[in-house]
């Protein structure tokens, strides 16, 4: 799995954890090990520009995903996973920090960035949360992936509750 994490934000983040949880999420979703993903960490000004340009919405947001090859997990266990360019995930640590502090289960900026990384991966794989049933499916997968990764890394306590809506 080729995953690049590029921190352009000026904020210190746990890039290794972002890389690790992205790799874990893609493995859990059975994406081909030769697929490629890029994660870019930006400041609020850059995120706001992207949010306006691509979503026509004001202000910065926490995470944006830009799919390339529209890879999907294999439908069957014996099916060969697809290979290709997943696309880009853009994260904003300043927004993540605020969301982590304001969440019902307060957590760190890095924990929020881990959650948002999984959220971005799921968007790249075609998951969405516009409709209630889609939201339940996506957030259920997101929680299972984050919990699984935390368990494998010996992290205890409750996983961050979803802060993206």
UniProtKB/Swiss-Prot annotation:
GO terms (BP aspect): rRNA processing
Entry keyword Cell division: no
Its EC number(s): 3.1.-.-
PROSITE patterns: UPF0054 (PS01306)
Catalytic EC class: hydrolase
Residues binding Zn(2+), per UniProt: 119, 123, 129
GO CC annotation terms, alphabetical: cytoplasm
GO MF annotations, alphabetized: metalloendopeptidase activity; RNA endonuclease activity; zinc ion binding
Coiled-coil zones: none
Cofactor: Zn(2+)
Comment on bound cofactor: Binds 1 zinc ion.
Pfam families tied to this protein: YbeY
This protein's UniProt keywords: Cytoplasm, Endonuclease, Hydrolase, Metal-binding, Nuclease, Ribosome biogenesis, rRNA processing, Zinc
Primary localization class, coarse: cytoplasm
Protein family (similarity comment): Belongs to the endoribonuclease YbeY family.
Record's protein name: Endoribonuclease YbeY
Organism: Streptomyces griseus subsp. griseus (strain JCM 4626 / CBS 651.72 / NBRC 13350 / KCC S-0626 / ISP 5235)
């Amino acid at each position: 799995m080729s995953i690049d994490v590029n921190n352009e934000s000026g904020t210190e983040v746990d890039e290794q954890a972002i890389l690790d949880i992205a790799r874990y999420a893609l493995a859990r979703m059975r994406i081909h090990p030769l697929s490629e993903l890029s994660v870019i960490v930006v400041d609020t000004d850059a995120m706001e520009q992207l949010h306006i340009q691509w979503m026509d919405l004001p202000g910065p947001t926490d995470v944006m995903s830009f799919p390339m090859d529209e890879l999907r997990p294999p439908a069957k266990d014996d099916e060969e996973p697809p290979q290709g360019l997943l696309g880009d995930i853009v994260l904003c640590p300043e927004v993540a920090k605020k969301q982590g502090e304001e969440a019902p289960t307060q957590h760190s900026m890095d924990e929020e960035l881990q959650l948002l990384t999984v959220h971005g991966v799921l968007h790249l794989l075609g998951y969405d949360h516009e409709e209630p049933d889609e939201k339940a499916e996506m957030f259920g997968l997101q929680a299972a992936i984050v919990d699984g990764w935390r368990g494998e890394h010996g992290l205890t306590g409750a996983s961050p509750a979803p802060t993206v809506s």
